[in-house]
């Protein structure tokens, strides 16, 4: 049910609950039995997005290869998730303190790989790892928002974000 609603909202982020139910092939009553309001649906989507992001980061094998290769894999995985959960980005998230703490925990492995890259001389050491991860996440959000207008797919979003990120974080000659 949540998967179907998420997919429907990815295609049409501003859809009403009735439109989400119809697009997902569900009866409106079925959707409302599980999520009585759009806010409840979005809260469930936020929780699911965090779980999926943690899984994607783990699956990115951050410790394999160079730190930049690990970051590249993470950006690719997170770009795909961003497109999938586009409605959360387009609508803006209701970011309470609990969500922000959970998001920080999910993103912590990325800060660790940035530190490893700094120690290896592959990432500028004058940039706080937290800032590099914030910049990466912000670019992903911006790229996913723009993808609806530009037609950029997951791969293009990942390429643009990673290219922009690495040109800013790698050591200057």
Language-model-derived ranges and their functions:
Residues 1-23:
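Short, amphipathic alpha-helix enriched in basic
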Residues 19, 39-40, 69:
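Residue-level preference for short helical/loop micro-motifs built around acidic side chains
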Residues 22, 36-37, 47:
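Residue-level detection of the helix-turn-helix DNA-binding "recognition helix"
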Residues 29:
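Key DNA-contact positions within bacterial/archaeal DNA-binding proteins
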Residues 89-92, 97-100, 104, 119-164, ...:
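Hydrophobic/aromatic-rich alpha-helical bundle segments in the mid-to-C-terminal region
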